[in-house]
């Protein structure tokens, strides 16, 4: 169930391209415009997507990853294993993690069937560096609404905000991946996880038929 919630949630996290980005210092504006741009692209490019579902990787690479804190999220997933990894191991892992996100997020976007969304009203940021933004996803086919909290983090150097995690039903996506990959990290280390991520990233994206 959580895996499905995570995939549905990713439908609204794909941010804007650099040329049309919203105010990078306001995570609420980023979330709002990102959702609108993403849904528009999914709707307008269905012919290309249906002809070649792996085209979704391109959308992810162009529109999402430049505005997601990939390395920060990847380091959180590694936890204690990050500090013990060599620079070469980290570089290989982050490259594999990025390719994994292209496949995983692309597969999530393949679930698009006309969903709509509501974003919580903007709250004062103050001096906060981590801000959760509640998004409610509404399914046109009558499924119950899904309420999610996207975690946005302020870059201490640039002042810009980027998304790095999502919490559904009190469970963090980062925590879920830590639990899912924990045994592999304990037995085969970061190299074993890197190899698995490379394998997963090679899987073809498949479209979910409308139910």
Curated annotation (Swiss-Prot):
Gene3D superfamilies: Tgt2/MlaC. It comes from the Bacteria. Keywords: Periplasm, Signal. GO terms for biological process: intermembrane phospholipid transfer; phospholipid transport. It holds the Pfam family MlaC. Its main location: periplasm. Residues 1-21 form the signal peptide. The keyword Cytoplasm does not apply. It is found in: Periplasm. GO terms for cellular component: outer membrane-bounded periplasmic space. InterPro entries: MlaC/ttg2D, Tgt2/MlaC_sf. Disruption phenotype: Mutation leads to accumulation of phospholipid in the outer leaflet of the outer membrane and increased outer membrane permeability. It confers sensitivity to SDS-EDTA. The keyword Signal applies. NCBIfam families: PRK15117.1 (NF011697). Belongs to the MlaC/ttg2D family. Involved in a phospholipid transport pathway that maintains lipid asymmetry in the outer membrane by retrograde trafficking of phospholipids from the outer membrane to the inner membrane. May transfer phospholipid across the periplasmic space and deliver it to the MlaFEDB complex at the inner membrane. Interacts with the MlaA-OmpF outer membrane complex and with the inner membrane ABC transporter complex MlaFEDB, via direct interaction with MlaD. This is Intermembrane phospholipid transport system binding protein MlaC.
């Amino acid at each position: 169930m959580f895996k499905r919630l995570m995939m549905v949630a990713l439908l609204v996290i794909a941010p804007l391209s650099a040329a049309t980005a919203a105010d990078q210092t306001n995570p609420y504006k980023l979330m709002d415009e990102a959702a609108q741009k993403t849904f528009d692209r999914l709707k307008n490019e269905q012919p290309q997507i249906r002809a070649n579902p792996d085209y979704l990787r391109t959308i992810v690479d162009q529109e999402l990853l430049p505005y997601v804190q990939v390395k920060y999220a990847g380091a959180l997933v590694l936890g204690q294993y990050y500090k013990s990894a060599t620079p070469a191991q980290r570089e290989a892992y982050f490259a594999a993690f990025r390719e994994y996100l292209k496949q995983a997020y692309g597969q999530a976007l393949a679930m698009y069937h006309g969903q709509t969304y509501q974003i919580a009203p903007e709250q004062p940021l103050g001096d906060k560096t981590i801000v959760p933004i509640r998004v409610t996803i509404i399914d046109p086919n009558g499924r119950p609404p899904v309420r999610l909290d996207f975690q946005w983090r302020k870059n201490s150097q640039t002042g810009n905000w980027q998304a790095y995690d999502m919490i559904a039903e009190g469970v963090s996506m980062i925590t879920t991946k830590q639990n899912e990959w924990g045994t592999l990290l304990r037995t085969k280390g970061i190299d074993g996880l890197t190899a698995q991520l490379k394998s997963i990233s090679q899987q073809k994206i498949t479209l979910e038929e409308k139910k």
